[in-house]
UniProtKB/Swiss-Prot annotation:
Residues 180-760 form the TBDR beta-barrel domain. Involved in the active transport across the outer membrane of iron complexed with catecholate siderophores such as dihydroxybenzoylserine and dihydroxybenzoate. It derives its energy for transport by interacting with the trans-periplasmic membrane protein TonB. Can also transport catechol-substituted cephalosporins. Receptor for microcins M, H47 and E492. Its main location: membrane. Residues 67-175 form the TBDR plug domain. Residues 1-31 form the signal peptide. SUPFAM superfamilies: Porins (SSF56935). Belongs to the TonB-dependent receptor family. CDD domains: ligand_gated_channel. The gene is fiu. This is Catecholate siderophore receptor Fiu. It comes from Escherichia coli (strain UTI89 / UPEC). Coiled coil: none annotated. One of its GO terms (cellular component) is cell outer membrane. A motif (TonB C-terminal box) lies at residues 743-760. GO terms for molecular function: siderophore uptake transmembrane transporter activity; signaling receptor activity.
Length: 760
């Protein structure tokens, strides 16, 4: 493990590869620049280059009024073309184009994460996922069939969206009707019985009206994982009125249904760094790894969810420079699941004989039955104007939002132990039955914000923004009395066993002030340097709508605790080269997170904890030539505890689930009019694992490289095929690991996906 910890070889290779890429681009840029100058000297008219399909020039969120190249933040925009070329069908797969971002954490103890459980720069970002700038609640997997582009903003986003994760946010932009008619359809088959079909129909009606319909159906097994299946269907109709006029109305609806088999992972026995949890179980030190195909759940396990979202947006151009928008959205995400996972540790192992093939491990049933709802109305005004010689690019607005969550209490499910090496899933514990011990959370928010970019001179810009949030959170929860184990309560006199008893009933109100400020200087027409500073806050209950009583306990949701606060400073540079077809960026960053909960010497808890994430990131997106496209990046990040208890398994101050080095690159080349080839590579460095007193579990996950490839063939203007190969060299790796380290999710083996794309 020591080599993986210090990365002497892997670090060199990834840095050398990316440095070589950048060095290789330089002479090309110089040559094209010289050619452009020669054309200018000959007074020829040179047409502007076609924007790259791999590098959208503008965020679709009106809060970001400047082009991506002039935004003083680290921002990656993953276009629809990238998603199509890679065959990425969900958000987690699309985010593989962003270095250091991924689903690295597999949950705590017996609990396992579901859906898009994203970590970014040392923090859980799964509750900072937005659709069209509006928070999307729920631990579900988000399909990309109705997605125009994915925008990843690193650093605090509190000024942009209110309470959020301290290190970044993710915004999925929905497809909208457009003023041209066409039909796009796809049919895919692949490894592990993968079957998927999509339909995208856009039809113009009259001069200013258009309708659009996106449909998706998918059914597949998880490659390399027995018994794990996924099935989802979606439909997204929309209509637009007033296209091309000063008044536009958009109506959208989204419905997605999923029927999946959750995966609790497999034991870490045999992984580097594993040792038996006790002397009596020492045979596990030499018994080898379990088969990665093993399924430790039951045939009754399920993860069902339904998403319904209705949106109305009205836009009015007051004049050529000023637009007002009003968006109303109602959304509901319902999810219920029964997920079985193993319980590691010596006390959970049963040894009928000395043969490890007869040993069993305890299983636990994780359950969830939850309904999330959001109702919001947002008004935004954008305007460009001058005050004297100073130009202004303003975005301002107000937001009213109500978010509610109900966690329905369910009766516990008891499961038999499972054989460590030969698990049997033919167990039928039945479904979930509600017991009335529910938890209800509601947060009402009123927010007002204002951003302005000031053009001081032709080359120098200042920008700033402030957001004020007034929030009120109410929370109550009940427990079925008379149970056993952690959190059990006795029944009050006269109350029957199993009856719900309210244990928490509290509320919290407050105000949040988030702000950001930056400056940008254009060194040339194509390149700039910038600095930025931003402050973001997350109040108690802001992450999960749950509150805890004041005065005792280590929950960050205690009503007497202050909001978590993040301060980020960034200095960077962005360059548009090769006739502005290719965007190169580099940035140094530091995020300090304050008000973390820590234990005092007397056993009480205070908010003196501090964390820090710092490092640098470089990225590339766009076209090297009209036929050669790429997107990628590299980051080095150091995430540590600055004040408080160390949480890594090895006792160091490092934050877990954060690769110190990460690299990603995807490149595609149009070899002929009909043939295209693509290839990509990703590197995720070794990561520390969290600690909860587990004995013998790996302290690190090993770093790994994964390569992908694509071959495309165009039959005619109406039909083309593409073959995607994932994990080309069939690399074995740990995709995610849980906090105790007793179980992990293996990475997907080599798989194939063949897609027929039709255009009319």
């Amino acid at each position: 493990m020591e080599n993986n910890r210090n990365f002497p070889a892997r670090q060199f290779h990834s840095l050398t590869f990316f440095a070589g890429l950048c060095i290789g681009i330089t002479p090309v840029a110089q040559a094209l620049a010289a050619e452009g100058q020669a054309n200018a000297d000959d007074t020829l008219v040179v047409e502007a280059s076609t924007p790259s399909l791999y590098a959208p020039q503008q965020s679709a969120d009106p809060k970001f009024s400047r082009p991506v190249a002039d935004t003083t933040r680290t921002m990656t925009v993953i276009s629809e073309q990238v998603i199509k070329d890679q065959g990425a069908t969900n958000l987690t797969d699309a985010l593989k184009n962003v270095p250091g971002v991924g689903a690295f954490f597999a949950g705590e103890n017996g609990n396992s994460t579901t859906g898009d459980a994203i970590y970014m720069r040392g923090a859980d970002t799964s509750n900072s996922i937005y659709i069209d700038g509006i928070r999307d609640i729920g631990s579900v997997s988000r399909d990309t069939f109705n997605t125009e582009q994915v925008e990843v903003i690193k650093g605090p986003s509190g000024t942009d969206y209110g309470r959020s994760a301290p290190t970044g946010s993710i915004n999925m932009i929905s497809k909208q009707p457009r003023n041209d008619s066409g039909i796009d359809a796809s049919a895919s088959i692949g490894s592990a019985w993968f079957r998927r079909g999509t339909l995208d129909v856009n039809q113009v009606i009259g001069d200013t009206t258009a309708v659009r319909l996106n449909v998706m159906g998918e059914k597949t097994h998880d490659a390399g994982r027995d018994k794990v299946k996924n099935e989802r269907y979606g439909v997204a109709p929309s209509v637009a009125f007033g296209l091309g006029t000063a008044n536009r109305l958009y109506l959208n609806y989204l419905h997605v249904t999923q029927h999946n088999t959750p995966d609790g992972g497999i034991p870490t026995i045999g992984l580097p760094g594993y040792s038996a949890p006790s002397a009596g179980t020492a045979a596990l030190n030499h018994s080898g790894k379990v088969d990665t195909h093993n399924f430790y759940g039951t045939d009754s396990d399920y993860d069902d969810s339904t998403t319904d979202t209705a949106t109305m947006r009205f836009e009015h151009d007051i004049n050529d420079n000023t637009t007002i928008r009003n968006t109303t959205r109602w959304s509901r995400v319902k999810q219920d699941y029964l997920m079985t996972a193993i319980m590691g540790g010596a006390s959970n192992i049963t040894q009928p004989t000395s043969d490890v093939n007869s040993w069993t491990w305890s299983r636990t049933a994780n359950t969830k039955d939850v309904s999330n709802k959001i109702l919001t109305n947002q008004t935004n005004l954008t305007s460009t104007f001058y005050t004297g010689a100073i130009g202004h690019d303003v975005s301002t607005g107000v937001e009213f939002t109500r978010e509610t969550q109900t966690n329905y209490g369910v009766n516990p499910v008891t499961l038999p132990a499972v054989n460590i090496y030969h698990p049997d899933s033919s167990i039928h514990p039945g479904g979930l039955t509600r017991n009335g011990a529910n938890a209800n959370g509601q947060t009402d928010t009123f927010a007002i914000y204002a951003f302005d970019t000031l053009q001081i001179t032709r080359d120098f810009e200042l920008n700033g923004g402030i957001r004020l949030d007034n929030y009120h959170t109410e929370y109550d929860s009940a427990t079925a009395c008379g149970g056993s184990g952690r959190g059990a309560i006795t029944c009050p006199a006269g109350v029957a066993k199993g009856s719900p008893v309210t244990t928490v009933d509290t509320a919290k109100s407050g105000n949040l002030v988030n702000w950001k400020a930056g400056a940008l200087y254009h060194l040339t027409e194509n390149g700039n340097i910038y600095i930025n500073y931003a402050v973001s806050q997350q109040p108690p209950g802001g992450n999960n709508f749950a509150l805890a009583q004041s005065g005792s306990g280590n929950s960050a949701n205690r009503t007497d605790f202050k909001p978590q606060k993040a301060n980020t400073s960034e200095i960077g540079t962005k360059w548009q080269v090769l006739d502005k077809r290719l965007l190169l960026t580099a940035a140094l960053f530091r995020t300090d997170i304050e008000n973390e909960v820590e234990q005092n010497d007397d056993g009480t808890y205070s908010q003196y904890g501090k964390k820090r994430v710092e490092g640098y990131e470089i990225s590339v997106a766009g076209n090297i030539t009209p036929a050669w496209q790429m997107i990628g990046g590299y980051t080095q990040q150091k995430a540590t505890i600055k004040n408080g208890k160390d949480v890594a398994q090895d006792g160091s101050s490092s934050l877990p689930y954060t690769p110190e080095h990460a690299f990603t690159l995807w490149s595609q080349y149009q070899a002929t009019d009909d043939i295209s080839v693509g290839a990509g590579a990703r590197y995720i460095g070794s990561m520390h694992k969290g600690s909860d007193g587990a004995v013998g579990t790996p302290a690190f996950t090993e770093g790994y490289w994964v390569a992908d490839a694509k071959l495309g063939y165009r039959v005619n203007r109406n039909l083309d095929f593409q073959l995607n190969v994932y994990n080309l060299f069939d690399t074995d790796y740990v995709a995610s690991i849980n906090k105790s380290g007793y179980r992990y999710h293996p990475g997907e083996p080599r798989t194939f996906l063949l897609t027929a794309n039709m255009h009319f």
